[in-house]
């Protein structure tokens, strides 16, 4: 057994999972959690893995990518998924939990492991030696300052401002056209043209749609040069036509005329399966957001794989800074895990902690770190955050659009998703004993 200790900073979903994975591999863990000594604006207890928003860990079926990632984690002995399964409450096809019981169960499993020592103190400097930073979206100001210094100002962010992303296969290609403004460079955007009547209908729905109430600690984010589309719209209908929906230089090749307004979609992944809606960062609730977006010509039946969000979130530019092992490129024994890496969601955060924990344990035991292939859900997330375009990097949920393409194209969505799931679970079984 190695005598080296791994520091894990933060006992949220990612940190708890990482600590457990390290400990079960016979390596000592020093798990730092500043609560209850210092609370965050969103947490209410001193328990590990406290769910601060919904009590749902989303879909539990294999027809959904987040269901596949859960099944992969079950096979890899995830403490988070084990606790969730034990504390589940009825939720149809989703995995929802009794949040208090769930946090208590995770705390018990992790705290009681003989290889885990819990330190209830705030860390303000990045420690020497093997370390996983899993401090989450509400990282304390002192540690944030340290991380900003480590990563560089341009690679450290304090909030999400992400536009919605849709599956290309769900776009009505008969209603959109490929073109760049003024035909500059290659035709890189799908353009959704609107008549004045279509724009008016869209505009009225947008300004009437319900938004997510801002938490007190999130109120500063709109003053940093990134305005939600509904706030722009509230300043007058022409704000959009002269802003993100301006049609100049985007003549419709079918009519030869310039539309009244245009919504542009930009490719979001290397495989060309996902497109983001340019300039549409939003604070709308998800139900109204879907209704509004489906008023855009070509997006009437759009499958939204990530809704637009604007919220407080501390995260790094992982494509520039991390390897798919969750190691920091400039320091082999420093790992990042959780939402800080740009994975979005409870399950995705825990999954990143699982892989970071495994690799930290392997590192101190003198073994090679593991890269999971992108045919797996966990591998596709690690690949996304480290190989996507660094310039437009924004956090992302698990979705089949991130998986490596299937060898054979399958038209029916249900069958295609089943093929992704089957392939992923076959592959992950090769890694269950690492």
Curated annotation (Swiss-Prot):
Could you tell me which Gene3D superfamilies the record lists for this protein?
A: FAD/NAD(P)-binding domain
Keywords per UniProt: Cytoplasm, FAD, Flavoprotein, Methyltransferase, NAD, NADP, Transferase, tRNA processing
Known catalysed reaction(s)?
Answer: uridine(54) in tRNA + (6R)-5,10-methylene-5,6,7,8-tetrahydrofolate + NADH + H(+) = 5-methyluridine(54) in tRNA + (6S)-5,6,7,8-tetrahydrofolate + NAD(+); uridine(54) in tRNA + (6R)-5,10-methylene-5,6,7,8-tetrahydrofolate + NADPH + H(+) = 5-methyluridine(54) in tRNA + (6S)-5,6,7,8-tetrahydrofolate + NADP(+)
Q: Which cofactor does it need?
A: FAD
Location within or outside the cell: Cytoplasm
Q: Which GO terms describe its molecular function?
A: flavin adenine dinucleotide binding; tRNA (uracil(54)-C5)-methyltransferase activity, 5,10-methylenetetrahydrofolate-dependent
Q: What is its EC number?
A: 2.1.1.74
Keyword Plastid assigned to the entry: answer is no
Q: Which residues bind FAD?
A: 10-15
InterPro entries xref list? FAD/NAD-bd_sf, MnmG-rel, MnmG-rel_CS, MnmG_N, TrmFO
Q: Does this UniProt record's set of keywords contain Cytoplasm?
A: yes
> What GO cellular-component annotations does this UniProt entry give?
cytosol
Which GO BP terms apply? tRNA methylation; tRNA wobble uridine modification
Any coiled-coil regions, as ranges: none
UniProt similarity note: Belongs to the MnmG family. TrmFO subfamily.
Purpose: Catalyzes the folate-dependent formation of 5-methyl-uridine at position 54 (M-5-U54) in all tRNAs.
What is the name listed in the Swiss-Prot or TrEMBL entry for this protein?
A: Methylenetetrahydrofolate--tRNA-(uracil-5-)-methyltransferase TrmFO
> Its gene?
trmFO
């Amino acid at each position: 057994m190695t005598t080296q200790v791994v520091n894990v900073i933060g006992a949220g979903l990612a940190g708890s999972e990482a600590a457990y994975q390290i400990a079960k591999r016979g390596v000592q863990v020093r798990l730092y959690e500043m609560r209850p000594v210092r609370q965050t604006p969103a947490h209410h207890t001193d328990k590990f893995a406290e769910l601060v928003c919904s009590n749902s860990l989303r879909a539990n079926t294999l027809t959904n990518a987040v269901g596949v990632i859960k099944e992969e984690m079950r096979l890899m002995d995830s403490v988070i998924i084990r606790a969730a399964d034990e504390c589940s409450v009825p939720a149809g096809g989703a995995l929802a939990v009794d949040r208090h019981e769930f946090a208590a169960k995770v705390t018990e499993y992790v705290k009681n492991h003989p290889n885990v020592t819990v330190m209830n103190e705030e860390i303000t400097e990045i420690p020497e030696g093997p370390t996983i930073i899993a401090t989450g979206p509400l990282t304390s100001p002192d540690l944030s300052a340290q991380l900003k210094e480590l990563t560089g100002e341009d690679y450290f962010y304090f909030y999400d401002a992400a536009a919605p992303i849709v599956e290309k296969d769900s776009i009505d290609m008969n209603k959109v056209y490929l073109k760049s403004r003024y035909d500059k460079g290659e035709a890189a955007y799908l353009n959704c043209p609107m008549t004045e009547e279509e724009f008016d209908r869209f505009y009225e729905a947008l300004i009437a749609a319900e938004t997510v109430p801002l938490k007190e600690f999130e109120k500063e984010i709109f003053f940093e040069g990134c305005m939600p589309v509904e706030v722009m719209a509230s300043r007058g209908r022409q704000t959009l036509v002269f802003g993100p929906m301006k049609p100049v230089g985007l003549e419709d090749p079918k009519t030869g005329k310039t539309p009244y307004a245009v919504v542009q979609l930009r490719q979001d992944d290397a495989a060309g399966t996902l497109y983001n809606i340019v300039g549409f960062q939003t604070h709308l609730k998800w139900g109204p957001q879907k209704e509004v977006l489906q008023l855009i010509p070509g997006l009437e039946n759009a499958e939204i794989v990530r809704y637009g969000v604007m919220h407080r979130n501390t995260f790094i530019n992982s494509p520039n800074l991390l390897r798919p092992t969750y190691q920091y490129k400039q320091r082999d024994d420093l790992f990042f895990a959780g939402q800080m890496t740009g994975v979005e969601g409870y399950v995705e955060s825990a999954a990143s902690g699982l892989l970071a924990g495994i690799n930290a344990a392997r590192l101190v035991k003198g073994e090679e770190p593991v890269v999971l292939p992108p045919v797996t859900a966990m591998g596709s997330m690690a690949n996304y955050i480290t190989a996507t375009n660094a310039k437009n990097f924004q956090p992302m949920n698990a979705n089949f659009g991130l998986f490596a393409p299937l060898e054979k194209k399958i038209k029916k969505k249900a069958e295609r998703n089943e093929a992704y799931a089957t392939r992923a679970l076959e592959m992950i079984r090769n890694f269950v004993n690492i």
